[in-house]
């Protein structure tokens, strides 16, 4: 019984740290990129025609901190899939492989182009993944 309590306490602590860690990533990336709340809200509403460099760099930061992009702005498909709801993972694998082939010398532009490519086929992702 005591062992179960310790396990539950440890698990609860880990989940709380993960939750706040994700919030810190968003906050840190907003601060680092200087993206406006308005640009983030427009993106969440589906406006992916913005030419906002700060938004693009926010997405790069967000994806790098979550391990989706490496330091060379290359996509780790397996890690990207882990951030999606299970119901979307199978259908997303081919799409991630297609979208990751986008070439761009600027890592911020590349991250934005990959998100745009993905969202064109799965717009519901903007509501499923906590970008804000």
Q: Which role does the model predict for each range below?
A:
Residues 83-123:
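Compact alpha-helical subdomains of small soluble proteins
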Residues 3-21:
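Cleavable N-terminal signal peptides of Sec/SRP-targeted secreted and luminal proteins
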